[in-house]
Amino acid sequence: MATHFARGILTEGHLISVRLPSQCHQEARNIPPHRQSRFLASRGLLAELMFMLYGIGELPEIVTLPKGKPVFSDKNLPSFSISYAGNMVGVALTTEGECGLDMELQRATRGFHSPHAPDNHTFSSNESLWISKQNDPNEARAQLITLRRSVLKLTGDVLNDDPRDLQLLPIAGRLKCAHVNHVEALCDAEDVLVWSVAVTPTIEKLSVWELDGKHGWKSLPDIHSRANNPTSRMMRFAQLSTVKAFSPN
């Protein structure tokens, strides 16, 4: 089972894809102008990822579930998740199960203008204890926020703030999610971007990509390379009942 995380910078023209169907452009015209460019960029990124991985020349039809989660109408196609952070667009895709992606810019987590800023989030006593022991508490808060939202986006219930439905135990590297039996999440804090990918039932392999419309795809360090980096801030969380060790082989 493979999982892919692709991202690109929302610069004019750089994420425009020729693989978008006319229906997608029509849908974009029906949303507010300030959201049109990022809508087309995210669909373009997904379309290019589907072409790279499967040779599918045009983005398949997407429908929206009742709680707002977009999915391919063809249930035989992979699960995907879309996220935005500043001028960056991200897409996660998994070949089996479901996935969720969330991203935050490092500087946004330190400012009042971010809708998911740490000051707007209530942490549990367990989470607060872990945060207090980290070298960069702001970054630690951002990691927990993105990790939580990636799991909620996986379940399709992103607005659910009930702690009984999702508990994070960062000291143990575990989580408890009431809606799925098996889930794993990976969260990394880079110099600019904090991101988290959650997958059911497990993350066996995660490839990281970057797309520039002018220069094409670029492969970024995968999770094993990141885990072996002495300065790595990567965290891996597994469902409480199915915890397994992370072996960078």
UniProtKB/Swiss-Prot annotation:
GO terms for biological process: lysine biosynthetic process via aminoadipic acid. It comes from the Bacteria. The gene is yieE. This is Uncharacterized protein YieE. The lineage of its organism: Bacteria, Pseudomonadati, Pseudomonadota, Gammaproteobacteria, Enterobacterales. InterPro entries: 4-PPantetheinyl_Trfase_dom_sf, P-Pant_transferase_sf. One of its GO terms (cellular component) is cytosol. GO terms for molecular function: holo-[acyl-carrier-protein] synthase activity; magnesium ion binding.
